[in-house]
């Protein structure tokens, strides 16, 4: 279970999050909705340990750390991959660093989205980059998959594929 208790975050004097508490059981699909600037991305970055914050975040009762972070994956429209690497290069990197990486799922999703294996990511369109973010998040073998606007930049047909 992913549990957030009284999460708060400020950027200078601007309060991005105030006393946010959530309990997310494994396997549940949850959507966060809010206006631009409401703190959705900030909350996800706090969960992943990318931002300091007030309050506590635990995964099955333990603080998120280097021992359990592999149980979380993240897909973002900010494109968090290495632009010079191809999907094949990313797969090789992830296989080396994420023991639970699912190569069969990776290939099935690459085929589903018809993404090229050997083209550098910097040559992908915005929509293709978003698809690849989702491929990597779903292939990592994580128990919890966080997605931050994974459909941004995709046309309506690609959104239906997702």
Which role does the model predict for each range below?
Residues 33-35:
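The feature captures the beta-strand-to-loop junction immediately N-terminal to the Walker
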Residues 156-158:
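Helix N-cap at the start of a conserved alpha-helix in ABC-type nucleotide-binding domains
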Residues 49, 55-68:
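Conserved ABC transporter NBD signature motif
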Residues 30, 41-50:
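Short, conserved post-Walker A segment of ABC-type ATPase nucleotide-binding domains
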Residues 76-132:
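ABC-family P-loop ATPase nucleotide-binding domains
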Residues 145-149, 154:
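Catalytic Walker B motif of ABC-type/P-loop ATPase nucleotide-binding domains
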